[in-house]
Amino acid sequence: MGILALVTDAVSLPIDYDMPPLLEACRTVGITAEVCDWEDGTVDWSRFEAVVFRSPWTWAERQAEFLAFCERVSHVTRLITPMPLVRWALDKRYLADLAAHGVPVIPTTVVAPGSDALAAVRDFLAARPEAREFVVKPTDGCYSKDVQRYQRSLAEPASRHVARLLANGSHVILQPYVESVDRHGETDLTFFDGVYSHAIHKGAMLMPDGTVHVPTLDFRQARDADEDQRAVAAAALAASVAHLGLDLPLVCGRVDLVRGADGSPMVLEMELCEPSLNLTFSEDGALRFAQALAERLKP
């Protein structure tokens, strides 16, 4: 078995809480793993048996550069996350694809660069008279960067936010704010090779006053997912595999769910390329991940 590269970056590694338990689990199952910085131009990627993206989260500021990096690396070694999945999973427009496959998702409107931001926000609110609050987010962000919660009356400030994101070349998502999040938070489910492993509860990140919390460990706690949640998350992963025409289940993935007005689970978002997997909240999660990776590394 060759060497496995665990890809991160210098900024993100200190907040990659999964890396220490994953490295230990890799040693346990006999994987030789090295932590590598995708921004380090001196790395010889051809010497690795395979590459798995763990926390290269600076991609959000340099998406085109990151995708070009992934393409280059894919020509000299094997990406555990194949390129079609990388491109698709880093753009939250995948929510429309999930919905087309019948997966329940938060109602989502996408605004394209070149659109009139104020008109887009007003049209969205007109179509959602029940939405007392709404959320603006880029389709290509992570860690709640550039995400904001707005009162319905704040269409103009929200439109300025949308305009700024559009000017940067991002598509923008508009969604009604799901009020149950304030009471119940979200449930984030982790899967390995399509099989449920564990879940956590995460408290609300977007505050009514506009404060946006960073999802540190303080906002997370272990929580088992119920059968309805597991079924929706599994359906989302199966739809992802079907949509992309992949031959294997995803080696890892996280599906974040919230409760709709009727209490049923729906997808908030997924992390399938470089997910934080909440391994510190599961006794055996890191080992299950390492075992899934070991299966992919078999000749």
Curated annotation (Swiss-Prot):
This is Cycloserine biosynthesis protein DcsG. Changing C142A: About 80% activity on D-OUS, 40% on D-homocysteine and beta-aminooxy-D-alanine. Gene3D superfamilies: 3.40.50.20, ATP-grasp fold, A domain, ATP-grasp fold, B domain. Keywords: Antibiotic biosynthesis, ATP-binding, Ligase, Magnesium, Manganese, Metal-binding, Nucleotide-binding. Mg(2+) 2 binds at E269. Involved in the biosynthesis of the antibiotic D-cycloserine (DCS), a cyclic structural analog of D-alanine, used as an antitubercular agent. Catalyzes the synthesis of D-cycloserine from O-ureido-D-serine (D-OUS). It reacts with D-OUS, D-homocysteine and beta-aminooxy-D-alanine. GO terms for molecular function: ATP binding; cyclo-ligase activity; metal ion binding. One of its GO terms (biological process) is antibiotic biosynthetic process. Its cofactor is Mg(2+). Disruption phenotype: Cells lacking this gene do not produce cycloserine (DCS). The gene is dcsG. The keyword Hydrolase does not apply. ATP binds at K92, K137, S144, Q175, P176, V178. Binds 2 Mg(2+) ions per subunit. It catalyses: O-ureido-D-serine + ATP + H2O + H(+) = D-cycloserine + NH4(+) + ADP + phosphate + CO2. The active site is at R220, R254, E271. Its EC number is 6.3.3.5. Optimum pH is 8.0.
